[in-house]
């Protein structure tokens, strides 16, 4: 009854298995894809009929990780998986972006792709497996889909490209790039890099696209064996007469409207033209569909903007193809934040802050691939007022998570190492105005805010969004695209980096036929734009401030003998708790004996360092210390000699004559000179007041080991 159809093939160093026909047979299509023990089960369901009045393509991609895949039980209160994590949201977007442009124009039937991770090998990331699964399931389903696509991860290790590197190999790699595309063309790139050149990045894209052809070939073979019949779907016939009538009424007016450079004015005028045109046409014929008229008008708008760009005319806002909008760069705009910047590029503006915290502020991420700690956090907020609209304000949406991740990738390569700058850093970008490429404005703002906060970043970084308009062999690459150019163009191409190289590259391509040469032109044009923006940013701040903000915690680092860690922590943490309360600092101790003391006041930090040095100091036999009587017993007295250490002065060692009663000589809290006679194997200390008084120069406290101290 169950008749699985299986295909196996070698993909780089991994074996990939595609299996269908075993599970979820009521779904339109279902595929289990595995790559060396990482397995993702992907299903596709498509509705045979579109909803009446549907005017957009309702594609939903859900990606969900099950903890049983890693042999674990969820740590949440209810012990089951909840809402998607940030990582799951990002992978859902990664699957969505290359498949969305491959559905035919006019197809508005609901389609849902669900990818469930059911087994995971910690060395093989499930994202590529899920992308291959989505491509295979859609190709098998019979739904109109111009795929399949392939997907590949590319690393760069020892000046060589590596196909689908393992998690361990990625740690050594200067590049983490995911590329997806069809047999003929690249459709999507998502990457972060350690400042690689334009040629190295382009080489990685081309390498990944060439290598993924084996995936496409095997999916095609699987479709021949197990594919369902293609749906008999036809696009609605074009109403040429209606198109001509709409164009006669609106084309010239829309062409004029798209010469208005101010976004709000232009939008208002376009809305007036559209509503007047629709009203005129409905007055002529009540049976016309308003949605259809809207689509025709949108197509005219698109054609107006594109034909003008291709003819070499100025763009919507009057700029030439490679011009950047006017820049305004300010730092230190908020008085109490640790670092802040306001970055404005035309009608796009980001208010960006940087906040410094201690290691305790780091985010612990319990992921399927294992637990990790993130000491650099980047959050991007896109409130509705940034585009002059009203709307819901609340938890971040998919787009905000995706843009925040892209901006983080742009800055990550220049962040200092934790051993040089032991702070957790959180950057928040508030988009206050938006008209094109707010994620790249966030990269620029983050670089400025980090410098303003005194974070010793390795270089300033800037980002730029590029666009493309292509008809046949004629194409134009646009620098610093507006929102309208993004919607009406054929490619969205974002590049972030420093003067030395690229730190992040994201590409979303809506058409086939983007050649290596076009990508080369776009990358080189983006480099010129990036260097221009960096030049303007450097006029505002050209290096990180020499010191961190007075409102930020200062972290001082000292080294102690690892054997002494237990003395500083104390029983059940009693000593370290008392220390933090007494000194008003935060103290963290690592297994190698590194102690980090965080304080907003330098004096408090010095006090904490002094106390830790006292606690960890070695007691010297034969040395005289000043101690304080802490307990009196019949046979002598216990004396504290600093650093939490206590020794016994036997009754015979109190004076050089017979002592009948200890209290005749000593009182609680009395300071006395004591000489260390012996420290036994259990660390018990024998002291003598009698011998100490014979020596005239007592030491104030135990001598501490030399501290390795830095800020």
UniProtKB/Swiss-Prot annotation:
Look up the domain of life of the source.
Bacteria
Per its UniProt record, what SMART domains does this chain match?
KH, S1
Enzyme class name: transferase
Entry annotated with the keyword Transit peptide: no
Give the GO biological process terms: mRNA catabolic process; RNA processing
Question: Does the record carry Protein transport as a key word?
Answer: no
Q: Which reaction does it catalyse?
A: RNA(n+1) + phosphate = RNA(n) + a ribonucleoside 5'-diphosphate
UniProt subcellular location = Cytoplasm
Region described as Disordered? 689-711
User: What is one cellular component GO term in this UniProt entry?
Assistant: cytosol
What is said about its interaction partners and assembly? Component of the RNA degradosome, which is a multiprotein complex involved in RNA processing and mRNA degradation.
Instruction: Identify its protein family.
Output: Belongs to the polyribonucleotide nucleotidyltransferase family.
Task: Return the protein name.
Answer: Polyribonucleotide nucleotidyltransferase
């Amino acid at each position: 009854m169950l008749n699985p159809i299986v295909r196996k093939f070698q993909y780089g160093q991994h074996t990939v298995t595609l299996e269908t026909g075993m599970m979820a047979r009521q779904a339109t299509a279902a595929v289990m894809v595995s790559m060396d023990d990482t397995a993702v089960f992907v299903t596709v369901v498509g509705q045979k009929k579109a909803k009446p009045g549907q005017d957009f393509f309702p594609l939903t991609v859900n990606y969900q990780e099950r903890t049983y895949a890693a042999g674990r039980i969820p740590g949440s209160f209810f012990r089951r998986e909840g809402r998607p994590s940030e990582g799951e949201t990002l992978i859902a977007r990664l699957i969505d972006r290359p498949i969305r442009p491959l559905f035919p124009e006019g197809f508005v039937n609901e389609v849902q792709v669900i990818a469930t991770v059911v087994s995971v090998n910690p060395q093989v990331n499930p994202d590529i497996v899920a992308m291959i699964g989505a491509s295979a399931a859609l190709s098998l389903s019979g739904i109109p889909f111009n795929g399949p696509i392939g997907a590949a991860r590319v690393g760069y290790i020892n000046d060589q490209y590596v196909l689908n590197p393992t998690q361990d190999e990625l740690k050594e790699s200067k590049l983490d790039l995911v590329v997806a595309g069809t047999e003929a063309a690249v459709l999507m790139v998502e990457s972060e890099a350690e400042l690689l050149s334009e040629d190295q990045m382009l080489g990685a894209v081309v390498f990944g696209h060439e290598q993924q052809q084996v995936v496409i070939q095997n999916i095609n073979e699987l479709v021949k064996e197990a594919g369902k019949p293609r749906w008999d779907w036809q696009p609605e016939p074009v109403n040429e007469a209606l198109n001509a009538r709409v164009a006669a009424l609106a084309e010239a007016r829309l062409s004029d409207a798209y010469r208005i450079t101010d976004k709000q004015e232009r939008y208002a005028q376009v809305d007036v033209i559209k509503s007047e045109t629709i009203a005129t046409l409905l007055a002529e014929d009540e049976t016309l569909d308003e949605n259809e008229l809207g689509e025709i008008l949108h197509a005219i708008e698109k054609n107006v903007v594109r034909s003008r760009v291709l003819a070499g005319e100025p763009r919507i806002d009057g700029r030439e193809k490679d011009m950047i909008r006017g820049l305004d760069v300010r730092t230190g705009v908020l008085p109490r934040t640790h670092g802040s910047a306001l970055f404005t590029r035309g009608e796009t503006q980001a208010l960006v802050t940087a906040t410094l915290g201690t290691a305790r502020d780091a985010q612990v991420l319990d992921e399927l691939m294992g637990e990790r700690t993130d000491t650099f956090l980047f959050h991007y907020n896109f409130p509705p007022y940034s585009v002059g609209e009203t709307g819901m304000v609340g938890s971040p949406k998919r787009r905000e998570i995706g843009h925040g991740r892209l901006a983080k990738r742009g800055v990550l390569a220049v962040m200092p190492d934790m051993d040089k700058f032991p702070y957790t850093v959180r950057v928040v970008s508030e988009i206050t105005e938006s008209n094109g490429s707010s994620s790249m404005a966030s990269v620029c703002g983050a670089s400025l805010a980090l410098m303003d906060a005194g974070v010793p970043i390795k270089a300033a970084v800037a980002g730029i969004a590029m666009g493309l308009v292509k008809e046949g062999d004629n194409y134009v690459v646009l620098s610093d695209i507006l929102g309208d150019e993004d919607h009406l163009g054929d490619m969205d191409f974002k590049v972030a980096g420093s003067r030395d190289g690229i730190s992040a590259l994201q590409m979303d391509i809506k058409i086939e036929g983007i050649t290596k040469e076009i990508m080369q032109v776009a990358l080189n044009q983006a480099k010129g734009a990036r260097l221009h923006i960096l030049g303007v940013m450097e006029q505002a701040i050209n290096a990180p401030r020499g010191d961190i903000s007075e409102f930020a915690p200062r972290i001082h680092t000292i080294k102690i003998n690892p054997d002494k860690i237990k003395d500083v922590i104390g029983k059940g943490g009693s000593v370290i708790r008392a220390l933090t309360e007494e000194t008003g600092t935060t103290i963290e101790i690592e297994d190698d004996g590194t102690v980090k003391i965080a304080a907003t006041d330098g004096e408090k930090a010095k006090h904490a360092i002094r106390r830790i040095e006292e606690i960890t100091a070695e007691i010297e036999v034969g040395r005289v210390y000043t101690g304080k009587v802490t307990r009196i017993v019949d046979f002598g007295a216990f004396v504290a000699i600093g650093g939490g250490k206590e020794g016994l002065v036997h009754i015979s060692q109190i004076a050089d004559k017979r002592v009948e009663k200890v209290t005749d000589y000593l009182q609680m809290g009395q300071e006395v000179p004591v000489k260390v006679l012996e420290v036994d194997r259990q660390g018990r200390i024998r002291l003598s007041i009698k011998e100490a008084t014979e020596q005239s120069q007592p030491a104030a406290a135990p001598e501490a080991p030399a501290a390795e101290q830095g800020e």
